[in-house]
Amino acid sequence: MSGALDVLQMKEEDVLKFLAAGTHLGGTNLDFQMEQYIYKRKSDGIYIINLKRTWEKLLLAARAIVAIENPADVSVISSRNTGQRAVLKFAAATGATPIAGRFTPGTFTNQIQAAFREPRLLVVTDPRADHQPLTEASYVNLPTIALCNTDSPLRYVDIAIPCNNKGAHSVGLMWWMLAREVLRMRGTISREHPWEVMPDLYFYRDPEEIEKEEQAAAEKAVTKEEFQGEWTAPAPEFTATQPEVADWSEGVQVPSVPIQQFPTEDWSAQPATEDWSAAPTAQATEWVGATTEWS
């Protein structure tokens, strides 16, 4: 579909995005109508999708979407969680009408219900999961575009874009690529400059993981505020008068104190030691007498 125009050729950065998101990885089962989009089969049984065919069908789908005069007449549907955020982002960027979540049966065929719509083009994320809108589209002659895996049935699908429609990153990247090509063909954005919208905004995120990340960020912010509060507290003001600092380089006069002279004693001239044996004997005699009197 790109023809000989170099502008429409797939760039190297686009190939790297496809490989990083796992868009080329199919399943272990293969539908006979999807054989034309298969490049090779791995030793573990996983089929590899030809990204060149993916890019050509992506451009064809973008041309079909641009051909609709009113962007609101394009309905984009995803009943699976992995594609709901991407569908809403695609609708916000291109002006399409999103249906994220459960598809109400009779939306395209039952004119009585309030949710009745008459779109001119239908784009679904998974032909197997979104079989109800595809079936109703066949009743009202509605052309359809679908992101198809290797095992996806192509019944009621007019334009099949071969890709991995199971992974959250692959589905988000395919919707991002489709939105970018639609805006480029409309002339809204230039091909010479990269689109400022990142593919991460189209990726599905688990609500539990988002809640855990927000909780961790809040705890980190509280800890940071407490840490900064300890260091940014105002220092106490000292109102006491500061003592004058003397010049330590000047010499300090120390008052002179006379040294007292003490006479030295001759320890060899001490009197002889008294006889300690007499005193205890006398004391013992006195105590004996006292005991005799008491008895």
Swiss-Prot record:
Required for the assembly and/or stability of the 40S ribosomal subunit. Required for the processing of the 20S rRNA-precursor to mature 18S rRNA in a late step of the maturation of 40S ribosomal subunits. Also functions as a cell surface receptor for laminin. Plays a role in cell adhesion to the basement membrane and in the consequent activation of signaling transduction pathways. May play a role in cell fate determination and tissue morphogenesis. Also acts as a receptor for several other ligands, including the pathogenic prion protein, viruses, and bacteria. This is Small ribosomal subunit protein uS2. GO terms for biological process: ribosomal small subunit assembly; translation. It comes from Chlorocebus aethiops. Transmembrane segments: none annotated. Its main location: membrane. Monomer (37LRP) and homodimer (67LR). Component of the small ribosomal subunit. Mature ribosomes consist of a small (40S) and a large (60S) subunit. The 40S subunit contains about 33 different proteins and 1 molecule of RNA (18S). The 60S subunit contains about 49 different proteins and 3 molecules of RNA (28S, 5.8S and 5S). Interacts with RPS21. Interacts with several laminins including at least LAMB1. Interacts with MDK. The mature dimeric form interacts with PPP1R16B (via its fourth ankyrin repeat). Interacts with PPP1CA only in the presence of PPP1R16B. This protein appears to have acquired a second function as a laminin receptor specifically in the vertebrate lineage. [DE]-W-[ST] repeats lie at residues 230-232, 247-249, 266-268, 275-277, 293-295.
